[in-house]
Structures are given as structure tokens and as C-alpha cells.
Swiss-Prot record:
Residues 177-209 are annotated as: Disordered. It is found in: Nucleus. The lineage of its organism: Eukaryota, Fungi, Dikarya, Ascomycota, Saccharomycotina. It comes from the Eukaryota. The keyword Glycosyltransferase does not apply. Keywords: DNA replication, Nucleus. SUPFAM superfamilies: GINS helical bundle-like, PriA/YqbF domain. GO terms for cellular component: CMG complex; GINS complex; nuclear replication fork. Component of the GINS complex which is a heterotetramer of SLD5, PSF1, PSF2 and PSF3. One of its GO terms (biological process) is mitotic DNA replication initiation. Belongs to the GINS3/PSF3 family. This is DNA replication complex GINS protein PSF3.
Amino acid sequence: MGYYDIDDILVDSTEVPCKFNYEIPGLGYLENNPGKPIRKNTKLSLPLWLARVLAIVGADSQEQEDMDPNAEEEDGGDAFVELLTPDMFSNKVINAIKTDPKSLDLHAINPYFLDMALKWIALYSDKDLGEIVYELLLERAQQINNYASSVSIDTEYGNKYRSALLDALRLQQNSANEDRSGPLASINGTSSLTTRSANNSGIGSSVGTSQATNLAASTRFLLKLDEFERQLYKDTHDSYRDTKKWVSK
């Protein structure tokens, strides 16, 4: 991750719920009340990059620093805002992770779930969440490796498989703004996306039932990966492909 890393910028722009600990003049526009103050205990969502700063900086400590920059820092009072637990880390999601991490649709919960989790863990030094996310990634990485190692792009079927997967990902991206029933909602129509992409690519008529079934199963799983996992799949797939090419020489 770096300053110009697009994924990191998108992660920091993810909105998280906050509660204001003070009444602050002139910020009413944040809740569509221009010219009005934002009231104490008001709850709204702010991008992570802003909420993180406001949750660390305390109003009293800032005033003390302005009056005497050399003064030793004391308790400092409350921070400007209190970060509330996002839906993506709610008990419902955590329980789903513990129950069956492989079937969880991380992309539907948040396309940058794992990157957000790392930032949240670092912010609160949350060891419990860290262990849960570690087990989640370990379980899913093994399955990602299985799918990445079983696909060959050196055959006609492999090329059509890749084409069908890309079509499914594009269809998923186009439907990303559709309503969902909450953070645990899976992407409705994943199976239909797979079938439609397979039909468009000609897989259904050119390969056996077993290969078509494998395509459907693997595509359903890959559509549930968040952006970090998709990059992991791509890197793993390319590594296996290059190794097979080298061995076949």
C-alpha cells in the first residue's frame, strides 16, 4: 500500500458510522442542514480517513496545545467523534465467518473487506478480530489455491473459462448498485450470471457436463472474493500457469 495506491484510497474512502461528542458550528451541511451546527450525539457516516483523525484528536487536548504547545499532554477529554462498529464487523458477520468462512460473500459485504479489517484492527489493537480475520483468510486462501491450480489457460476450454469469468465479473460490477438485504446478503443471481456467461462463451455446447459444473462452482466462489482475494487468485493462477509452461518445455 502506498500514497498513490488506488485500492488504498478506495479503502480509506469507505464510510464508517460515527457519533459526534460535541456540538460543532458550521458542520450542519454534513446532515443536509447548511449553516446549522451539528448537534452532540448526532450519528452519521464519514469516510474512514476523516473519521480516524477525528476519533483520535480530542477537543480539550487541541485547545490546550493551542494555548501552550510545550505543555505536557494530559487526559485530553473526549475525541471529536466516537467510531461505531460498522455493519461489516457486526456480530452477525463475525458469527457467519466462524460458521463457514468459505461460503461467505465478502464482496457483497464490502469489496475491500480484508483491507478494512486490517485498518480497523490496527486502529483499536483488536486481537480478537485479528484472529478471526486470520482464520478467515487462511481458510479461503486454501480454496483460492485449489481453484487457481486447477485451471489451465493453454486449452480452448481454459480460454473460454477465463472469458466467462471476466463476463461474470463485469455483470457483477454493473449490478453493484442494486439493493441488498444487508451486509450478509449474497449477490442475487450469481448462478444466473455464471450460466449466462457460460452460454455466451459457448462452454455449455463445447465441453462436457463435468467441466461446465466445475465452471459454475468455481465462478460462484470467485464472485464472492473481495479485491485482495481476487488479486491473490490472479497472482496464484499466473504462478501455476508459468510453472506449467516451464515444466512443459
